[in-house]
Amino acid sequence: AKDASLWTDTTEAQWLGWLDIVPAQLREVGRFAGIAHAVQERGFTDIVLLGMGGSSLCPEVFSLSFGQIAGFPKLHVLDSTDPAQVLSLERRVNLKKTLFIVASKSGSTLEPNIFKQYFYERSGRDGSRFIAITDPGSKMEQIAHAEQFAHIFYGVPSIGGRYSALSDFGMI
């Protein structure tokens, strides 16, 4: 019934999209498999997810829970601005064989944008090795088009970041 009063009496009604996400995503299972195989076919050995908070927590939990699947790239999550962690991650991957996923609902979150710019420069400004996951109409969508990212996946605007685990933010 999407009764927002069960949670709060504020603006919660505009953030209840997570209640419908499971059936919607179940219809997309083939799309997710296709993405995985396309990434595999391109020969990537690593995937670095660049995000903060809700945009990166679920992928990190999935990675830690299920590990790497044989024959597919290893997932690394960068959600720290500590320069030592950024450099440590950079040293663990072959940048020429790494796919970068920039995850930001608003597209204007400072940390993922800084991470994106750093690795975009370090990878020779090759947008074909970047994917964006962002809400429609965001600044990140504009950047992804301008820099010719390989793909843009869209979040559901009615799902808040902390509830985005079962949307494309968690599933891609």
Q: Where are the language model's segments positioned?
A:
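Extended, charge-enriched "interface" segments that sit outside catalytic cores
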Residues: 1-41
